């Protein structure tokens, strides 16, 4: 028999789970097109706005935890995905999780979820982000489950034992605590829409083909160096350079370089085609000189949606350019950047900083560090990383309509 105080605590706990978190104080203003823009405290709102502006970010976590009808259960499913099968540990309500079971195909798991949903149960699923993409997540959501995808995690540090059943059991236990209100148990990621994922993949395919060109070009240099004792110049596969060096090659080396050159030219044509497609996305925009349409379009694709960030700290953290920290008490120690973020975006931003330092030195972030130049008048590398973090914040401000390029000090435009 529960006491009145215990009953009150349980009722309050249930109400707490149903109510979404209170939003942060925000200023709402109308843009020229009539779309409301939300500006949190500390960011200035201007009339400039990105073409796809909308008022609120997409939440990572469910805004409420549904309660099943009388006599029905809340089912928590921890999933470990493999190419051959799916291992699932299932917990009904707050009972002991059942031993892990295997589903031969994702379709079998989706059919099982549909069966439980048709019976009136609430189903939660969780699995780690991996190379299998988000197809399973889309199917589970369509089947009626509340599907969560998390970052790859070291689930158990205390044991030197790891297998599919142990991993799925740990995910199930963490999911149970997450549903009970412990949000720190799972690091939920934002799953992109299909259109966003395809737009992002275009830029990554371009990077893939560029990597192939570099690998094949280096292979050709190594081939000539081994058999002729001489190397090949940069872009040796280009028509002008190839016309000059072809008579100098021995028949043996030429026999291998000619088909290799054809493959490089085919890959180069693919890169050029993807570059035109990517730059066309921002062809009508005025872009700061040094940033360039290619970098801006690739950054937009990697972020997917700039409105996903609620404040300026979020895009800075997403780059992985924040310093690591090991502090205790009154002692604070910071170290190298944590690299906990999007590596593709981090590379784009760091490269853009070096160009902006030359072509747009009036950028407000660069002016602050003008006195930190070294003896050669160049920017130290550690400051370039800090500027890359600030550039992510400035891109977020511009793409969400909080500021303009001119207000941030970008005067040279293309």
Residue ranges of predicted features:
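A short, charged helix-loop
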Residues: 173-201, 239-251
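Phosphate-backbone recognition surface of nucleic-acid-processing proteins
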Residues: 286-289, 293-294, 298-376, 380
């Amino acid at each position: 028999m529960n006491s009145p105080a215990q009953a009150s605590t349980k009722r309050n706990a249930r109400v707490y789970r149903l109510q979404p978190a209170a939003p942060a104080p925000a200023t709402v203003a109308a843009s020229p097109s009539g779309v409301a823009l939300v500006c949190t405290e500390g960011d200035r709102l201007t009339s400039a706005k990105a073409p796809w502006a909308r008022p609120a970010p997409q939440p990572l976590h469910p805004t409420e935890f549904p309660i099943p009808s009388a006599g029905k259960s809340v089912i928590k499913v921890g999933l470990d995905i493999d190419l051959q099968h799916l291992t699932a540990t299932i917990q009904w309500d707050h009972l002991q999780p059942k031993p892990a079971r295997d589903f031969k195909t994702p379709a079998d798991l989706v059919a099982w979820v549909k069966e439980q949903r048709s019976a009136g149960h609430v189903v939660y699923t969780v699995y780690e982000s991996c190379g299998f993409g988000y197809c399973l997540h889309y199917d589970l959501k369509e089947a009626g489950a509340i599907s969560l995808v998390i970052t790859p995690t070291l689930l158990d540090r205390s044991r030197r034992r790891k297998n599919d059943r142990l991993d799925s059991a740990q995910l199930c236990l963490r999911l149970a605590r997450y549903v009970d209100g412990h949000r720190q148990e799972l690091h939920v990621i934002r799953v992109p829409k299909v259109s966003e994922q395809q737009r992002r993949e275009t830029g990554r395919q371009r990077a893939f083909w560029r990597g192939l060109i570099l690998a094949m070009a280096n292979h050709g240099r190594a081939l000539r160096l081994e058999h002729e004792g001489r190397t090949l110049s940069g872009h040796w596969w280009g028509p002008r350079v190839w016309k000059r060096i072809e008579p100098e090659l021995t028949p043996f080396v030429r026999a291998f370089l000619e088909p290799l050159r054809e493959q490089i030219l085919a890959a180069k044509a693919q890169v050029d085609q993807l570059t035109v497609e990517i730059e066309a996305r921002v062809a009508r925009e005025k872009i700061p000189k040094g940033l360039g349409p290619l970098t801006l379009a690739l950054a937009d694709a990697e972020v997917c949606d700039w409105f996903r960030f609620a404040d300026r700290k979020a895009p800075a953290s997403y780059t992985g350019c924040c310093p690591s920290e090991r502090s205790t008490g009154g002692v604070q120690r910071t170290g190298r950047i944590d690299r906990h973020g999007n590596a593709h975006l981090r590379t784009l931003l760091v490269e853009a900083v070096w160009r902006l330092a030359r072509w747009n030195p009036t950028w407000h972030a660069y002016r602050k560090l003008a006195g930190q130049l070294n003896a050669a008048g160049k920017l130290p590398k550690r400051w370039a990383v800090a500027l890359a973090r600030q550039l992510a914040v400035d891109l977020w401000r511009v793409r969400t309509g909080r500021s303009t390029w001119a207000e941030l000090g970008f005067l040279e435009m293309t």
